[in-house]
């Protein structure tokens, strides 16, 4: 997983490309508070790769249970 995620903060477009989902899905997750935790830098939405990794691992655990 660490090989795939960059060492910089991700944009919604980066996250969508990484997960193979439309960008609108990333924004819907944000509105519904179901996706990875994001934060704002001024007007720009960013995602910490560590938070994305934790969210993916959580989704994998939920899918197994």
Regions found by a protein language model. Name each.
Residues 1-28, 58:
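Polyanion-binding surface elements
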Residues 18-46:
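Major-groove DNA-recognition helix of helix-turn-helix-type DNA-binding domains
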Residues 11-12, 21, 41, 45, ...:
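Hydrophobic aliphatic residue packing
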Residues 50-65:
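A short, Lys/Arg-enriched interface patch at domain edges and termini
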Residues 13, 36, 63-64:
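Serine/threonine-rich, low-complexity intrinsically disordered segments
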């Amino acid at each position: 997983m660490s090989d795939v995620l960059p060492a910089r903060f991700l944009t919604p477009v980066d996250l969508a490309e990484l997960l193979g989902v439309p960008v609108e899905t990333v924004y819907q997750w944000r509105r519904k508070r179901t996706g990875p935790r994001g934060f704002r830098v001024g007007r720009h939405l960013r995602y910490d790769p560590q938070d994305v990794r934790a969210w993916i691992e959580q989704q994998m655990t939920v899918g197994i249970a």
